[in-house]
Amino acid sequence: MKTVVLLLCLLGSAQSLPRQLSPALGAPATKPTPGQVTPLTQQQPNQVFPSISLIPLTQLLTLGSDLPLFNPATMPHGTQTLPFTLGPLNGQQQLQPQMLPIIVAQLGAQGALLSSEELPLASQIFTGLLIHPLFPGAIQPSGQTGAKPDVQNGALPTRQAGASPANQATTPGHTTPAVTDDDDYEMSTPAGLQRATHTTEGTTMDPPNRTK
């Protein structure tokens, strides 16, 4: 857009100023005789502005030349370049990513939208920016990171890593020890192994001698 305005300014100034100046005093030259013909395609040495047909448009209209002024290091993240043809010019059109609007709402006591006349003096104004979750920089809420809220509060015991929340709420003082019966142990013993039995037959223990 800036280059188009610059081109129009150059055209207006070229038409308003005189085309030829006197080489000696700088005064406008006299009118040529009717028999004298000046070629239009040949540029005169004392001509202030050359003919517009001799100026290459590729030097004036350079689309995208003002983009490095805003971001000289690199192109903006998320921009897309689409080639297009404008007459003899070949440029690139810059498309900005879709920007989501900023919502500003004024809420009353009951949470309803109120006008400026009905608002109290100490009104609350909530401002939020909608960010698409696929955009870079989007932050997920803490409840959606994969961990449960009740698990994030405290560490789990050793044997309760996969237990239900009802079991996680029990304190160490209320836990009951595991009781194994002899019948269950005998059923769980493999066939090739023998269980060690505690026998007290034939073993006597003498009390220590007491000195009187």
Curated annotation (Swiss-Prot):
Pfam families: Amelotin. O-glycosylated. Phosphorylated by FAM20C in vitro. It comes from the Eukaryota. InterPro entries: Amelotin (IPR031501). Keywords: Biomineralization, Cell adhesion, Glycoprotein, Secreted, Signal. One of its GO terms (cellular component) is basement membrane. The keyword Signal applies. Highest expression in the mandible. Found in the basal lamina of maturation stage ameloblasts of incisors and unerupted molars. Also found in the internal basal lamina of junctional epithelium in molars. It is found in: Secreted. The keyword Membrane does not apply. Residues 1-16 form the signal peptide. Residues 23-42, 141-212 are annotated as: Disordered. Residues 33-42, 165-178 have a biased composition (Polar residues). GO terms for biological process: biomineral tissue development; cell adhesion; odontogenesis of dentin-containing tooth; positive regulation of biomineral tissue development; positive regulation of enamel mineralization. Belongs to the amelotin family. Is a promoter of calcium phosphate mineralization, playing a critical role in the formation of the compact, mineralized, aprismatic enamel surface layer during the maturation stage of amelogenesis. This is Amelotin. It comes from Rattus norvegicus.
